[in-house]
Amino acid sequence: MKSLKKQRRIQIIALATVALVGSTALIGYAMRDGINYFRSPSQVMETPPEPTETFRIGGLVEEGTLQRGQGEAVRFSVTDGGASVPVTYVGVLPDLFEENQGMVGTGRYVNGVFEASEILAKHDETYMPKEVVDALKEQGVYREGDS
């Protein structure tokens, strides 16, 4: 009688372990495309990511680089004071988007150009992640009055 209880307990523990591992794997698989890593322009230039990798880049819109093309096409460079990365974006820019202001973009780095699929302009801490502030402070270009 004891061996049947012991065997049943082992089966339940094994089944629970398999279920836990399976659910963890499914959650990880589902989240893999939803996680966007943050990089500063210096990090992008030091170690360029794969063209298939979606990530976020943040910094200041470099002065004198904002060019509006036909339609909603826009080209500019984002800098952290140490490096600049050219950015292209097709879409409507946020109202507060301008040169020498903070921005965060989501997209891919292809052939030396960051192709943004989303641009957020900084107007408060909601749009300026701590990583961007830290990167700008590290480069010595962050202004406290900007936040």
Curated annotation (Swiss-Prot):
InterPro entries noted in UniProt: CcmE, CcmE-like_sf, NA-bd_OB-fold
GO cellular component, one term: plasma membrane
Membrane topology category: Single-pass type II membrane protein
Residue spans crossing the bilayer: 10-30
Disulfide bonds: none
Domain of life of the source: Bacteria
One matching Pfam family: CcmE
UniProt-annotated location(s): Cell inner membrane
Gene3D superfamilies xref list: Nucleic acid-binding proteins (2.40.50.140)
Keywords attached to this entry: Cell inner membrane, Cell membrane, Cytochrome c-type biogenesis, Heme, Iron, Membrane, Metal-binding, Signal-anchor, Transmembrane, Transmembrane helix
The keyword Electron transport is annotated on this UniProt entry: no
Residues where heme binds: 123, 127
A single GO molecular function term of this UniProt record: metal ion binding
Entry's family note: Belongs to the CcmE/CycJ family.
Free-text function comment from the UniProt entry: Heme chaperone required for the biogenesis of c-type cytochromes. Transiently binds heme delivered by CcmC and transfers the heme to apo-cytochromes in a process facilitated by CcmF and CcmH.
Protein name: Cytochrome c-type biogenesis protein CcmE
Native source organism of the sequence: Ruegeria sp. (strain TM1040) (Silicibacter sp.)
Source organism phylogeny: Bacteria, Pseudomonadati, Pseudomonadota, Alphaproteobacteria, Rhodobacterales
